[in-house]
Curated annotation (Swiss-Prot):
It comes from Pseudoechria curvicolla (Podospora curvicolla). Residues 92-95 are annotated as: G3. This is Elongation factor 1-alpha. The modification N6,N6,N6-trimethyllysine is found at residue 80. Keywords: Cytoplasm, Elongation factor, GTP-binding, Methylation, Nucleotide-binding, Protein biosynthesis. CDD domains: EF1_alpha (cd01883), EF1_alpha_II (cd03693), EF1_alpha_III (cd03705). Belongs to the TRAFAC class translation factor GTPase superfamily. Classic translation factor GTPase family. EF-Tu/EF-1A subfamily. It is found in: Cytoplasm. Residues 15-22 are annotated as: G1. The modification N6,N6-dimethyllysine is found at residues 3, 317. Residues 71-75 are annotated as: G2. The keyword Protein biosynthesis applies. This protein promotes the GTP-dependent binding of aminoacyl-tRNA to the A-site of ribosomes during protein biosynthesis. Residues 154-157 are annotated as: G4. The gene is TEF.
Amino acid sequence: MGKEDKTHINVVVIGHVDSGKSTTTGHLIYKCGGIDKRTIEKFEKEAAELGKGSFKYAWVLDKLKAERERGITIDIALWKFETPKYYVTVIDAPGHRDFIKNMITGTSQADCAILIIAAGTGEFEAGISKDGQTREHALLAYTLGVKQLIVAINKMDTTKWSEARFNEIIKETSNFIKKVGYNPKTVAFVPISGFNGDNMLEASTNCPWYKGWEKEVKGGKATGKTLLEAIDSIEPPKRPTDKPLRLPLQDVYKIGGIGTVPVGRIETGILKPGMVVTFAPSNVTTEVKSVEMHHEQLSEGVPGDNVGFNVKNVSVKEIRRGNVAGDSKNDPPLGAASFDAQVIVLNHPGQVGAGYAPVLDCHTAHIACKFAELLQKIDRRTGKAVEESPKFIKSGDAAIVKMIPSKPMCVEAFTEYPPLGRFAVRDMRQTVAVGVIKKVEKAAAGSGKVTKSAAKAGGKK
């Protein structure tokens, strides 16, 4: 396969705080990854000087994370690694303060979640206990449409590579992920040591009893021994190029000599120079002069591309972060007057009733929305209603809620445009709930601003 032919996939790594996520992820990036040798040598030297030699893989990640938190790394290449079949991007290194928020508003949908479980006595139990983070992260991944899962059972060296312990953990974890919604038969369970490297890229000699993992896939079975092979057995995603354009703006820049340049990630559809786009909810329509990525002109941008595009006769004051660009001729985006969403309350100290008005983070928008009406309480796993018009909901509950944004915002139904149909509910500096939008009541399309160039471009086509 030529270098360019590989499919790009996104994975999210979840698990308890001490499961060894950083070490395992660091190891993959380190061995197959986008970090150049010079950087690694620099990290190793620093780690040794600080007496942190034993943490070298985690250290790689800590350094990257520190840079990311300080806003230095625009260069996400560091978070990439390559398998024989895929280019893999680690969407979020957990342990990050805003992991839950990032996963929802996150720059992209994960194609697969890798759940890392620590095999050590007591460690495993802590990780999947009732209030464990692991449960919350796994539930979140499932709710947000990440339907593929790999389970890596880490720190097997601390159990002296005990087959009995491995089987016990598979049994417990299978029950656990089944409750969340995953089918264990479709999941690869891989015993690893993220630190020593066993079964990461090459089969380990420390577990002669281990015959390999197997899982059901469309049209048969997939088998393998290592975590890398398990990642390669992820079913490739269908990228939504055939859907109408949706591009949530991350920023809008004013660049001397060029003009107004909105920047964001194409979630669905295609963006080309010469297209006439409409921004919602600000209701501005204009022509796209040029599209670029990494300082190179593009003839077209596709889903997943982070692009900047130059628009004619629109000032920086008219469009802003949180607006969504779409094709004015093909299902253009509109503001939402209200929307119904399935909301899962994760951790709210009290009860949530009608009138509650927290901030919603949906794609790049950050806007207060009122819980106008609790329509029904539902069973989280089946989605069936268990109570009509409940008075309030509390932690652990799921409900269908009618929501009204406090100011114009553009959202979509999850089934139509997934990245614009999931949100985090933020209150008290944490994520108190997550939601998936079922249907949207669009605001009436008023007569917005249409620039001259848009009218002209619209006329000639």
